[in-house]
């Protein structure tokens, strides 16, 4: 009986990896990928934002905050704030629920996103496969009058986009054990068209839209010695119109309490990361990006803070602090 059971489980795992590989190959077929969504360095702790399948994955109710100031010293540079909540639900806790509020400010643009996530897990002996759905709404405000205008006769200087709403529908898949994880997601499958201007007399037409973003995340936890773990992680982001963005982080976890490491955003930034598990319920993480592009002549870098509060920490949970 054990041999039959083992054979069935192996067949299931092979099929799962075939599904994941097929989806990944599908993404690779996209070419000419532009960054339009906000970026953040501590993605391994805020996976729920771009992958709904992560909601409830840690088996505990959590409240998370992430704040980022990008390209310090540059007026109008991106500023991002995220508040997210997730919890397992159901008698067997094979489902997850998540809520998040996301705000991104870049110059005259202020975008806010409200979303709800639902996740469903299929458990195996030492791992689980989770599918997630995301639904929400985006609100965008744009005030061109905030720009430094050289041509005051431009009729569109005073054009204001106020609370332009767009629906959001996203999907994700997340496969993990206690030691490794792999996730693939598209947090919004709908193209967001924020405004269209047309002037027949001058044949002027302009449209601002947001393309579909794809995220691939993965990581592993190595036990170097009983008190030290090595946690490499990577995030690949692709969007039509720009080169693929690749983040790689190398973190260490000391005594299950202190996190430190470095990260690299390919051809963009080198980052230092540090974090502390203040208590069973509270974790604080910090990161500082040193820009490696031409922007470094005008900016002193980018700063990010992450705070996570867990509720019900007396329960036994899967991978409590590793990812």
Report each predicted region and the residues it spans:
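Bacterial N-terminal signal peptides that target proteins for export
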Residues: 10-20
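Subset of outer-membrane beta-barrel
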Residues: 35-323
């Amino acid at each position: 009986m054990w041999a039959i059971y083992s054979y069935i489980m192996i067949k299931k795992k092979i099929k799962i990896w075939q599904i994941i590989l097929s989806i990944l190959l599908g993404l690779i077929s996209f070419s000419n990928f532009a960054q339009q969504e906000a970026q953040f360095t501590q993605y391994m702790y805020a996976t729920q934002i771009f992958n709904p399948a992560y909601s409830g994955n840690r088996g505990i109710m959590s409240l998370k905050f992430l704040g980022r100031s990008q390209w310090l010293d540059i007026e109008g540079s991106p500023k991002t704030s995220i508040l997210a909540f997730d919890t397992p639900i159901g008698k067997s806790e094979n489902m997850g629920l998540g809520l998040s509020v996301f705000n991104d400010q870049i110059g005259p643009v202020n975008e806010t996103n409200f979303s709800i996530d639902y996740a469903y897990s299929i458990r195996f002996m030492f791992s689980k496969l989770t599918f997630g759905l995301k639904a929400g709404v985006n609100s965008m405000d744009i005030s061109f009058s905030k720009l430094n205008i050289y041509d005051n006769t431009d009729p569109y200087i005073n054009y204001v986009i106020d609370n332009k709403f767009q629906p959001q529908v996203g999907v994700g898949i997340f496969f993990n054990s206690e030691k490794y994880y792999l996730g693939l997601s598209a947090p919004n499958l709908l193209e967001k068209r924020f405004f269209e201007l047309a002037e027949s007399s001058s044949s002027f037409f302009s449209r601002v839209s947001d393309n579909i973003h794809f995220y691939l995340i993965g990581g592993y936890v190595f036990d170097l010695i009983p008190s030290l773990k090595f946690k490499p992680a990577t995030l690949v982001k692709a969007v039509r119109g720009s080169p693929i963005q690749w983040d790689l982080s190398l973190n260490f976890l000391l005594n299950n309490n202190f996190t430190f490491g470095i990260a690299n955003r390919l051809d963009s930034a080198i980052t230092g990361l540090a974090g502390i598990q203040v208590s069973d319920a509270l974790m604080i993480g910090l990161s500082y990006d040193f820009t490696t592009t031409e922007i470094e002549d005008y900016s002193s870098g980018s700063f990010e803070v992450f705070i996570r509060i867990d509720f019900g920490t007396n329960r036994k949970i899967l991978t409590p602090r590793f990812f």
